[in-house]
Amino acid sequence: MTKKWSIVATALAGVVMCGALVYYNFIDKKKVVEGVAVGDTCPDFTVDTIAANDGVFGFDGNEYNLYANNGKVRVINFWATWCGGCKEEMPHFNEFAKAYPEVEVIAICGESGPKDVVAEWMNTDALHVQASGWANFSLQFGFYGPDDENVYYSLGGTSMLPMTVVVDEDGVIRYNKEKNLDFEGLQQIVLPLLND
């Protein structure tokens, strides 16, 4: 009987220790935010932009600021190089950006490493074979790194990618979800905002 209780106590202590490790190491109190909801004013943010020069991606020293382009509907997509679903939906976002140039579409990549890694990846990734090259994409690309993660979290991100936020002309969030979207899904969300 004592051996049985000893095993139970050890297992319980292990569960408590694992919970404490997860809590103190993986749940950063600065990152746990209330998040924004549909109908809220979108918080302003600025990210570095990634651009192609002669077909080669790099950081061009420019920035994207959400409210610099107030008066337009904006589609903000958060993705990462390791996210398979993100890469699957990227051609849909590109197709949407080409079809609706009056809508501003930006794909913001978040990585834990240096930003140059993203540009290198975009220059060599296999997706360029499917999409005729990242450089031919019509949407804008941005980057947020370890020091800028508040951009993702301040817009309601938790831990899942891809995430898309749609902001209307007045800066009000009209869509905010962590899920994949295709061209038709983007149309269903954005087109009613263009007809307001």
Q: Predicted segment positions?
A:
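N-terminal targeting signals for export/organelle localization
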Residues: M1-G55, Y175, N195-D196
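A short beta-strand-turn-helix
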Residues: T46-R74
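Short pre-active-site segment immediately N-terminal to redox-active cysteine/selenocysteine motifs
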Residues: K72-R74, F78-W82, M160
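Conserved redox-active cysteine motifs that mediate thiol-disulfide chemistry
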Residues: F78-E95
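Residue-level recognition of beta-strand->loop/alpha-helix junctions
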Residues: A107-E111, F143, K177
